[in-house]
Amino acid sequence: MAVESTMLELGTKAPDFTLHDVVSGRTYTPEAFERNKAFLVMFICNHCPYVKLIKEDLVEYASDYMPKGVGIVAISSNDIENYPEDAPDKMKEDAEEFGYPFPYLFDKEQEAAHAYKAACTPDLFLFDENQELYYRGQFDSARPKNDIEPTGEDLRDATDRLLAGEPAPEKQIPSMGCNIKWKKGNEPAWYG
C-alpha cells in the first residue's frame, strides 16, 4: 500500500537510536554524526518498488554529498517475519550489490521508525549541523510507472540550500512509498 510521509515538524531534534550496520557490524547513533554539516536519515528497504527505482540515485547522491560533510544512514524497519527479503542478510546483499557508501541499519524493534514517525519507504529526514530537522520530503517526483527519471532533485536542492546556509525550502512535498511493514500489534497511531 502506497502512503505518504507524516511530515515530522521542522526543527525537531534528530531522535536517538542505537542500531547495527548489517555490512560492518558497527553500531551507529545520531551522535556519531554530530560533527557533520548535515545528517540524512533514510528509511528504505529492499523489496519496495519506490525504493528500487531510486537505489542507484541514492548512491549517486551519497557519493556527491558525503565528501561535502553530509553524514548518511539508511534504516530498514520492516517486519522480517512477513517480509524476509528485508532481513539483515538480504540487506547486506543489497548494500553490497549497489555499493552503498553509507551504513545500512536494521531496526528490528521498529523503535527508530516510531521515533521518526516514519511511514513509508523511502522516508527521508535531513537534519542541519545542530541535528534539527531541516527537510523531510520526497527524493524527487519519480514514481514507479510515471515515466519520470529519478534525479533526487528535491533532496539535492534542500541539501544545497542547507550547506549554503539558506533557509529550508518552503515547499516540501511528502515522500511516497510502500508503508513500513509493522509487526502485528506494533502499528503506530498514525498508521492506517
What residue spans do the PLM features occupy?
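Chalcogenol-based redox active-site neighborhoods
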Residues: 1-172, 179, 186-192
